[in-house]
C-alpha cells in the first residue's frame, strides 16, 4: 500500500511538471510606427559658431523586439523651418553621407523669435505631415571660466564607478530679471562624454534659475567623473538656454529613463511633434530652439 502511494505521488508530480513545460505562443501586435525627431534651431553667442548651420535628424520608431542594428532613418522627407516673425522659409536638404540627417547652412537664428518645423515624410507605409514650434528668448549668458575638481569614488560625489577623474565646474553670471532654463553638455576631444556604465547615456545636466542667483561663483556640471586618458585633452562645455517646455520635457524623459533601470523610459513622454495627418499618432522626440554659449579648456596635469 505504501508503494502505491509513492507511485501515485510520482505520477502527480510528473503530470504537474509536464503541464508547467507547455509552451503557449501569444501573438502581439506591434504598435504603429511613429516619427522620431531630434534637433532644432540655435543661436550662438560665439560668433565663430554662428554660421547658419542647423540640423534635424529623422527616424522611425522600431518594434519592441526589432533589431537595434537595423537602419530606422527616414530618407526622402521634405523638411522646412519657418521663422514665424518674418514668414521666411528655410529648406533643409538630406545629407549625402548620412541618411535621415537634414541640414541647412542658411538659417542664422535670431533672439526673441520662434520657429516652426514642417515635415512631410513616409512613416511606415503612410505619407504623414508634422509640425512643431519652439522659441528663442534672450541670449545665453557667457561662461567666464571653466575649472576642474579632482575627485575619486571615496569622496562620494560621483556615481559612475570610475576610480578617479575630474568634476567640471564653470562660473557665469545668471540674470535675475528672467526665469531661465539651461541644458549643459560636456565634450571631451570634440565628442559628447557618455556614461558607459549605464549603457551609453549622454552626460547632460539640466538647471533652472530658481536654484541660481546672480553672479554664480561655480556650478558643478555633473556628478559624474570625467574619465581621463591623459592631461592636456581639450574639454568644451556647451550651455544652451532653452524654453520652459523643453526643460520639462527633457527632465521628464531623463527621470523616467533613470527610474526604468534600462535605456527605455518607464512611460512614453510626449513632446511637441504634432501629427497633422493623425493627431493621435503624434511624433516622438522634440524640436527645440535656444541660445548657446560655450567655453573650452584643457585637462590639467
Where are these regions (language model features)?
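C-terminal motif of bacterial Sec signal peptides marking the signal peptidase cleavage site
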Residues: 17-19
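Sec-dependent N-terminal signal peptides
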Residues: 6-15
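Positively charged n-region of N-terminal signal peptides that target proteins for export
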Residues: 1-5
Amino acid at each position: 500500500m505504501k508503494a502505491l502511494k509513492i507511485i501515485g505521488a510520482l505520477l502527480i508530480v510528473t503530470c504537474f511538471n509536464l503541464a508547467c513545460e507547455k509552451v503557449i505562443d501569444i501573438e502581439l501586435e506591434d504598435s504603429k510606427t511613429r516619427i522620431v525627431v531630434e534637433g532644432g534651431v540655435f543661436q550662438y553667442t560665439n560668433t565663430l559658431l554662428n554660421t547658419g548651420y542647423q540640423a534635424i535628424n529623422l527616424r522611425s520608431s522600431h518594434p519592441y523586439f526589432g533589431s537595434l542594428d537595423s537602419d530606422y532613418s527616414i530618407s526622402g522627407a521634405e523638411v522646412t523651418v519657418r521663422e514665424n516673425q518674418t514668414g521666411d522659409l528655410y529648406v533643409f536638404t538630406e545629407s549625402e553621407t548620412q541618411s535621415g540627417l537634414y541640414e541647412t547652412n542658411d538659417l542664422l537664428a535670431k533672439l526673441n523669435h520662434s520657429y516652426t518645423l514642417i515635415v512631410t515624410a513616409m512613416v511606415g507605409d503612410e505619407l504623414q505631415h508634422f509640425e512643431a514650434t519652439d522659441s528663442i528668448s534672450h541670449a545665453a549668458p557667457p561662461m567666464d571660466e571653466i575649472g576642474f575638481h579632482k575627485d575619486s569614488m571615496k569622496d562620494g560625489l560621483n556615481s559612475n564607478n570610475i576610480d578617479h577623474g575630474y568634476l567640471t565646474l564653470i562660473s557665469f553670471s545668471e540674470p535675475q530679471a528672467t526665469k531661465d532654463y539651461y541644458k549643459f553638455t560636456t565634450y571631451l576631444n570634440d565628442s559628447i562624454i557618455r556614461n558607459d556604465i549605464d549603457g551609453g547615456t549622454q552626460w547632460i545636466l539640466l538647471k533652472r534659475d530658481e536654484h541660481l542667483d546672480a553672479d554664480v561663483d561655480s556650478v558643478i556640471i555633473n556628478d559624474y567623473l570625467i574619465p581621463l586618458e591623459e592631461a592636456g585633452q581639450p574639454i568644451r562645455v556647451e550651455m544652451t538656454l532653452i524654453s520652459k517646455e523643453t526643460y520639462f520635457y527633457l527632465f521628464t524623459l531623463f527621470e523616467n529613463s533613470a527610474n526604468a533601470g534600462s535605456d527605455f523610459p518607464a512611460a512614453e513622454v510626449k513632446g511637441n511633434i504634432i501629427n497633422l495627418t493623425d493627431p493621435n499618432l503624434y511624433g516622438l522626440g522634440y524640436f527645440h530652439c535656444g541660445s548657446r554659449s560655450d567655453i573650452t579648456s584643457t585637462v590639467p596635469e
